[in-house]
Amino acid sequence: TAAVFVKFRKKPTKEQLIEKLESYRGVPQELDLPSAPKQFIRYMQEDDRPQVQLDVDYENGMGISIGRIREDSIYDFKFVGLSHNTVRGAAGGAILCAETLKAKGYIQAK
């Protein structure tokens, strides 16, 4: 779980920020890799989400859950982000890296 504070050169509206987060597609999504989450980032509208027990396994642990987006007096926005440290950060991240390397031709079968 992370408390995130962001500031932009040109401040978007909250709705624009949510739309950009939800529509984000990275290289793993563009390549349609087997372990890549279909929707990498999801925004949760509930005031008490994301929560570890309820949301850590989103997209089999490979997705990111974001919620509680609020305007901030120092930064533009603040929000809570949640990802699975072992699945997304270590084991699953390593698998995703290997899949990316193979898809881009850096790893080839003998």
Please provide the spans of the model-predicted regions.
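C-terminal substrate-binding/catalytic lobe of Rossmann-fold NAD(P)-dependent oxidoreductases
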Residues: 1-78
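Generic C-terminus detector
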Residues: 76-110
